[in-house]
Amino acid sequence: MVNVVVASSDGHVSAASVHGSNSGQGPLGDEAVVLLHGLSQQRRFWDPVVSRMRQWPVVTVDQRGHGASTAVASDDYSIDRCARDIIELAADLNLARIHVVGHSWGGAVALRVAAAAPGLVASACLIDGGLTTPSAPSGSDPDRRAELLARLRPPALGIPIDDIWRIIGEGMGGSLTLEMRDALAPTYEIGADGLARTVIGIDRHMAVLEGLLDYEPWPDADSLLVPRWAVFCEPRHAQADEVRLRVIERTQHLPTALVQRWNGALHDVPLQWPSLVAGLVDSLVESSASDLARSS
């Protein structure tokens, strides 16, 4: 693995990790898998998945406002701007083709990357995100937007890190492995008071969320011609969310879309079932290569 500094065209700096082979060595080449984390996370969130993948090289990146990113709360967090960061990253790494995979909020960024740069993106995968967050653009119903922002506002934390691990472990079904903890550790920082808070903080978190609510995914989803796989994580009991069911049905009718519904999967399935997610991404890349060979 090689860590690199990346710069955006609007003057911000962040960090990416390039995984060249199973041993962490080897040339990058001109094609790679790019994994995009969700809101409040950072590039090491993907470590459990990357360590199990067979398809190389793989690039993980601290997206705008996250991890090592220097972007502040007043900067542009539109999905379009975040997607441009990834397109610029690919250019900086001399990548001619990428397979872009996004989890949660990262799914929206992945979708926009695929739509904005069709010549760059060989395939796209949205893991429990990208299509399911309600759109509430600025200028639309202000009450609805305010309600969504209030409902999705994260807790301020400021609690002992051991309490965070306990809460996450309970959310993961009572099991938080050392591997999971290592993947999540850079998400938090310990303040002078000895208490843990997210690195992104509340202000940047809400700025990213505002950008997400401004995004309408369906024009981009309808326009894609490359293979796109969409995973929906579902509870063990029968799915009763009518809005989500309509999203799944609409996604199933998209051209080139393959929908998977993972019963029993938690939203953070890359941590819960990293082998399954690694196999998904490997299969996406392999099938895309087969499709390209048949069409040439």
Language-model regions, residue ranges each:
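A short loop-to-beta-strand scaffold at the N-terminal edge of the catalytic core in hydrolase folds
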Residues: 2-5, 9-25
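Conserved HGGG/HGGXW glycine-rich cap/lid loop of the alpha/beta-hydrolase fold
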Residues: 18-71
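Flexible "cap/lid" loop of the alpha/beta hydrolase fold
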Residues: 115, 122-159
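Catalytic histidine-centered segment of alpha/beta-hydrolase-like enzymes
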Residues: 262-274
